[in-house]
Amino acid sequence: MKRNKIAVMILTVMCFATLCGCGVKSGEEFTEEVNILEGAALTVDAERATSTGITYTISNQSEKDLSYGRDYSLQQEKDGRWYRIEPKSEVAVTMELLWIPAGNADTEEISWEDAYGKLPAGNYRILKSFSDNERGYYLTGEFRIE
């Protein structure tokens, strides 16, 4: 039973990793629901945000264990709406299955200079996909580049 559960979780994460940007072309508005899992949050350390990377924390105070991967995408805010930013070069991430048990948090640091270059001044957010045993969720964390 546990082996089947792990296999389902791996397949779910792989599907989300593959579909994370599907259907949304660069410059198109992103309209999917985000941040709807009660008790789960992705926050960006505003003091450490630069044009080439951020440090963010995933907090899971929900009652569910969450799984996720290393993949992410960046979006830019324009006129109160969010638009996907197209990477300047191919992005390769490992297909690791990472876990955040209920009641825990994890802090990550990422650099996107190779994929996105240096971001100009503006409002941005990182988008990551997560799943529990029942469904998938998008979590976002907003930040500003001066």
Task: Enumerate the language-model features and the residues they cover.
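Intrinsically disordered, low-complexity Pro/Gly/Ser/Thr-rich segments with frequent PxxP/GP/PP motifs
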Residues: 90-117
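Primarily secretory-pathway and cell-envelope proteins
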Residues: 22-86, 90, 99-100, 129-146
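Short, functionally important structural connectors and interaction interfaces within domains
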Residues: 11-14, 34, 58, 92, ...
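Sec-dependent N-terminal signal peptides of Gram-positive bacterial secreted proteins and lipoproteins
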Residues: 2-25
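Hydrophobic alpha-helical segments, principally membrane-spanning helices and signal/leader peptides
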Residues: 6-8, 86, 107
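A short tyrosine-centered beta-strand micro-motif
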Residues: 105, 119-129
